[in-house]
Amino acid sequence: RATVVEALVDGGASELLEEGDRIRPASTGERNDLYARHASPLAVEAGGRALAAAGVDPAEVTHVVTASCTGFVSPGPDLALVRELGLDPGTARLHVGFMGCSAAFPALRTADAICRADPDAVVLVVCVELCTLHLTASDEPEQIVAMSLFADGAAAAVVAARPASGPVLALDGFLT
């Protein structure tokens, strides 16, 4: 499981642990501070890998669409992507926030609409979630299942209307 919460990593800091090694609920401020520190670097790493895998030069990116529901920071990962990946400062940016687990679908739908409207558009879509920030100690089955399914991470895709040189996936429809 990936986590940015050091207290959950072997040998990590104990700022989120109570006596008896029980996780205490972090305050909203503590969770958001961790989100602000870790979300952008994860997004940049995923975005850079997606561009490299697609063989797309950062200068070709016309739009950035990001999605996240586990925290908020402004300026956010969208601006970090532009700055740290060397995208044009005028790159259009959009953040899809607080739409839950399925936010990648509206983000991809937005990228698809951009590319249908402008066949020369190249859209970098990056989703970043830091789910372990919201980990709570509980013996409720729903909480146990949720915490066993979700971890911290980021995923990215490059969406374009132009012909690709290698294997691609087609965005054929969205039902969210």
Enumerate the language-model features and the residues they cover.
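Generic secondary-structure signature for well-ordered alpha-helical cores
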Residues: 52, 56, 86-87, 113-119, ...
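Glycine-/small-residue-rich "gating" segment that lines the acyl/pantetheine channel
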Residues: 91-109, 116, 130-165
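Conserved catalytic cysteine-centered active-site region
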Residues: 22-25, 30, 37, 41, ...
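Phosphate/pyrophosphate-binding loops at sites that engage ATP/ADP/AMP, CoA/4′-phosphopantetheine
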Residues: 46-61
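Conserved beta-strand elements of the Class I
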Residues: 62-65, 122-124
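Condensing-enzyme catalytic core mediating Claisen C-C bond formation in acyl metabolism
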Residues: 1-36, 122, 137-176
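Conserved nucleotide-sugar donor-binding subdomain of glycosyltransferases
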Residues: 35-46, 50
